[in-house]
Structures are given as C-alpha cells and as structure tokens.
Amino acid sequence: MTDLNLPSIFVPLVGLMFPAIAMASLSLHIQKNKII
C-alpha cells in the first residue's frame, strides 16, 4: 500500500512545488532588476 500511496502523493506535490518555486524565483529576479 505504501509503495502505491507514496508516488500518488509525491508526484502532485512536486508538480505543484516546482512551478511555485520557479515563479517565486522569477518574480524575485524581476523585482531585483526593477530596483536596479
């Protein structure tokens, strides 16, 4: 059960976290460029 449960929780978590981190780093990069 755990072998089937872990990927089903892990994959959507990564699928949501990776774009969120990418968007956050992108927005911070844009803010730094605007300030400078």
Swiss-Prot record:
GO terms for cellular component: chloroplast thylakoid membrane; photosystem I. It is a single-pass membrane protein. The keyword Iron does not apply. Keywords: Chloroplast, Membrane, Photosynthesis, Photosystem I, Plastid, Thylakoid, Transmembrane, Transmembrane helix. The keyword Thylakoid applies. InterPro entries: PSI_PsaI, PSI_PsaI_sf. It is found in: Plastid, Chloroplast thylakoid membrane. It holds the Pfam family PSI_8. GO terms for biological process: photosynthesis. The chain crosses the membrane at residues 6-28. It comes from the Eukaryota. HAMAP family: PSI_PsaI (MF_00431). May help in the organization of the PsaL subunit. Belongs to the PsaI family. This is Photosystem I reaction center subunit VIII. It comes from Calycanthus floridus var. glaucus. The lineage of its organism: Eukaryota, Viridiplantae, Streptophyta, Embryophyta, Tracheophyta. The gene is psaI.
